[in-house]
Protein backbone atom coordinates (compact mmCIF):
# COMPACT_ATOMS: atom_id res chain seq x y z
CA UNK A 1 0.00 0.00 0.00
CA UNK A 2 1.49 3.34 -0.97
CA UNK A 3 1.64 6.38 1.24
CA UNK A 4 -0.58 8.17 -1.20
CA UNK A 5 -3.41 5.67 -0.66
CA UNK A 6 -3.03 5.55 3.11
CA UNK A 7 -3.42 9.30 3.48
CA UNK A 8 -6.44 9.66 1.21
CA UNK A 9 -9.70 10.49 2.96
CA UNK A 10 -12.12 7.63 3.53
CA UNK A 11 -14.63 7.12 0.76
CA UNK A 12 -18.06 8.51 1.58
CA UNK A 13 -20.90 6.04 1.56
CA UNK A 14 -23.92 7.13 -0.42
CA UNK A 15 -27.27 6.20 1.05
CA UNK A 16 -29.13 6.86 -2.18
CA UNK A 17 -29.00 4.74 -5.33
CA UNK A 18 -31.65 6.41 -7.50
CA UNK A 19 -32.90 2.93 -8.47
CA UNK A 20 -36.20 3.50 -6.65
CA UNK A 21 -37.01 6.82 -8.27
CA UNK A 22 -39.59 5.25 -10.58
CA UNK A 23 -41.55 3.49 -7.84
CA UNK A 24 -39.79 0.13 -7.67
CA UNK A 25 -37.49 -1.42 -5.11
CA UNK A 26 -35.45 -4.61 -4.81
CA UNK A 27 -36.22 -7.50 -2.49
CA UNK A 28 -33.43 -9.37 -0.71
CA UNK A 29 -34.45 -12.40 -2.75
CA UNK A 30 -33.55 -10.53 -5.95
CA UNK A 31 -36.58 -9.38 -7.92
CA UNK A 32 -37.68 -5.78 -8.24
CA UNK A 33 -41.26 -5.00 -7.25
CA UNK A 34 -43.45 -1.93 -7.03
CA UNK A 35 -43.26 0.06 -3.83
CA UNK A 36 -46.96 -0.67 -3.41
CA UNK A 37 -46.38 -4.46 -3.54
CA UNK A 38 -47.91 -6.32 -0.56
CA UNK A 39 -44.45 -7.34 0.67
CA UNK A 40 -43.23 -3.75 0.66
CA UNK A 41 -46.42 -2.55 2.37
CA UNK A 42 -45.96 -5.23 5.04
CA UNK A 43 -42.25 -4.63 5.64
CA UNK A 44 -42.92 -0.88 5.77
CA UNK A 45 -45.59 -1.34 8.44
CA UNK A 46 -43.26 -3.61 10.43
CA UNK A 47 -40.53 -0.96 10.21
CA UNK A 48 -42.95 1.76 11.34
CA UNK A 49 -43.91 -0.42 14.29
CA UNK A 50 -40.29 -0.79 15.35
CA UNK A 51 -39.88 2.99 15.11
CA UNK A 52 -43.02 3.58 17.20
CA UNK A 53 -41.75 1.15 19.84
CA UNK A 54 -38.39 2.94 19.74
CA UNK A 55 -40.17 6.23 20.37
CA UNK A 56 -41.92 4.74 23.41
CA UNK A 57 -38.62 3.39 24.70
CA UNK A 58 -37.01 6.82 24.38
CA UNK A 59 -39.23 8.10 27.20
CA UNK A 60 -37.37 5.97 29.74
CA UNK A 61 -39.55 2.99 30.56
CA UNK A 62 -39.16 0.63 33.51
CA UNK A 63 -36.20 -1.68 32.88
CA UNK A 64 -38.30 -4.83 32.48
CA UNK A 65 -40.67 -3.17 29.99
CA UNK A 66 -37.77 -1.67 28.05
CA UNK A 67 -36.11 -5.09 27.80
CA UNK A 68 -39.32 -6.68 26.51
CA UNK A 69 -39.69 -3.98 23.88
CA UNK A 70 -36.07 -4.21 22.76
CA UNK A 71 -36.46 -7.96 22.21
CA UNK A 72 -39.62 -7.26 20.21
CA UNK A 73 -37.77 -4.74 18.04
CA UNK A 74 -35.09 -7.34 17.31
CA UNK A 75 -37.80 -9.85 16.36
CA UNK A 76 -39.39 -7.24 14.07
CA UNK A 77 -36.08 -6.89 12.20
CA UNK A 78 -36.04 -10.67 11.68
CA UNK A 79 -39.64 -10.62 10.45
CA UNK A 80 -38.91 -7.77 8.03
CA UNK A 81 -35.96 -9.70 6.66
CA UNK A 82 -38.11 -12.81 6.26
CA UNK A 83 -40.73 -10.82 4.34
CA UNK A 84 -38.25 -9.34 1.87
CA UNK A 85 -36.08 -12.46 1.49
CA UNK A 86 -38.72 -15.11 0.90
CA UNK A 87 -38.90 -16.59 -2.58
CA UNK A 88 -42.41 -16.77 -4.07
CA UNK A 89 -43.85 -20.28 -3.93
CA UNK A 90 -41.15 -21.62 -1.57
CA UNK A 91 -41.77 -22.04 2.11
CA UNK A 92 -39.03 -20.69 4.35
CA UNK A 93 -38.40 -21.56 7.96
CA UNK A 94 -40.66 -18.99 9.64
CA UNK A 95 -39.18 -16.52 12.09
CA UNK A 96 -42.19 -16.87 14.37
CA UNK A 97 -42.57 -20.24 16.08
CA UNK A 98 -45.63 -21.40 18.09
CA UNK A 99 -43.69 -20.80 21.30
CA UNK A 100 -43.26 -17.13 20.37
CA UNK A 101 -47.03 -16.60 20.41
CA UNK A 102 -47.32 -18.38 23.78
CA UNK A 103 -44.50 -16.23 25.17
CA UNK A 104 -46.44 -13.07 24.28
CA UNK A 105 -49.56 -14.52 25.92
CA UNK A 106 -47.59 -15.14 29.11
CA UNK A 107 -46.29 -11.56 29.07
CA UNK A 108 -49.83 -10.24 28.54
CA UNK A 109 -51.16 -12.31 31.44
CA UNK A 110 -48.33 -11.24 33.77
CA UNK A 111 -48.56 -7.56 32.82
CA UNK A 112 -52.34 -7.50 33.16
CA UNK A 113 -52.58 -9.19 36.58
CA UNK A 114 -52.31 -5.96 38.55
CA UNK A 115 -54.55 -3.87 36.29
CA UNK A 116 -58.14 -3.02 37.20
CA UNK A 117 -60.85 -4.43 34.92
CA UNK A 118 -61.80 -2.29 31.94
CA UNK A 119 -65.16 -0.57 32.29
CA UNK A 120 -64.99 1.54 29.12
CA UNK A 121 -62.88 2.15 26.05
CA UNK A 122 -59.43 3.56 26.77
CA UNK A 123 -58.74 6.94 25.21
CA UNK A 124 -55.05 6.98 24.23
CA UNK A 125 -53.07 9.59 26.10
CA UNK A 126 -52.08 9.91 29.71
CA UNK A 127 -48.32 9.91 30.05
CA UNK A 128 -46.08 10.40 27.00
CA UNK A 129 -44.77 6.79 27.15
CA UNK A 130 -48.32 5.40 27.47
CA UNK A 131 -49.47 7.48 24.51
CA UNK A 132 -46.45 6.31 22.49
CA UNK A 133 -47.25 2.66 23.30
CA UNK A 134 -50.87 3.21 22.23
CA UNK A 135 -49.57 4.64 18.95
CA UNK A 136 -47.33 1.57 18.60
CA UNK A 137 -50.40 -0.62 19.23
CA UNK A 138 -52.29 1.10 16.40
CA UNK A 139 -49.30 0.71 14.06
CA UNK A 140 -49.10 -2.95 15.10
CA UNK A 141 -52.71 -3.47 14.03
CA UNK A 142 -51.89 -1.88 10.65
CA UNK A 143 -48.90 -4.20 10.27
CA UNK A 144 -51.15 -7.14 11.10
CA UNK A 145 -53.60 -6.08 8.37
CA UNK A 146 -50.73 -5.71 5.88
CA UNK A 147 -49.58 -9.25 6.72
CA UNK A 148 -53.09 -10.57 6.06
CA UNK A 149 -52.99 -8.93 2.61
CA UNK A 150 -49.54 -10.44 2.02
CA UNK A 151 -50.74 -13.91 3.02
CA UNK A 152 -53.64 -13.64 0.57
CA UNK A 153 -51.27 -12.64 -2.24
CA UNK A 154 -48.52 -15.18 -1.46
CA UNK A 155 -49.53 -18.47 0.13
CA UNK A 156 -45.85 -19.27 0.84
CA UNK A 157 -45.86 -16.67 3.60
CA UNK A 158 -46.35 -18.25 7.03
CA UNK A 159 -49.57 -17.56 8.94
CA UNK A 160 -47.74 -17.53 12.29
CA UNK A 161 -46.72 -13.87 12.22
CA UNK A 162 -50.38 -12.85 12.00
CA UNK A 163 -51.16 -14.49 15.36
CA UNK A 164 -47.95 -13.04 16.81
CA UNK A 165 -48.86 -9.50 15.70
CA UNK A 166 -52.37 -9.99 17.07
CA UNK A 167 -50.92 -10.83 20.51
CA UNK A 168 -48.31 -8.10 20.22
CA UNK A 169 -51.06 -5.50 19.80
CA UNK A 170 -52.67 -6.84 22.98
CA UNK A 171 -49.34 -6.71 24.83
CA UNK A 172 -48.71 -3.11 23.78
CA UNK A 173 -52.20 -2.20 25.00
CA UNK A 174 -51.62 -3.81 28.41
CA UNK A 175 -48.15 -2.26 28.76
CA UNK A 176 -49.59 1.18 27.94
CA UNK A 177 -52.25 0.76 30.62
CA UNK A 178 -49.53 0.06 33.20
CA UNK A 179 -47.89 3.42 32.52
What are these regions (language model features)?
Residues 1-179:
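Phosphate/pyrophosphate-binding loop motifs in nucleotide- or prenyl diphosphate-using proteins
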Amino acid sequence: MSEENSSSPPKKVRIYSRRGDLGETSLFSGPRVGKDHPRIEAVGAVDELSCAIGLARSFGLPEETDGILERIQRKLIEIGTEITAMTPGRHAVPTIQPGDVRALEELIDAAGESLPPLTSFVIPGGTPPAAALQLARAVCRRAERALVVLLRSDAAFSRRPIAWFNRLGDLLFVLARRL
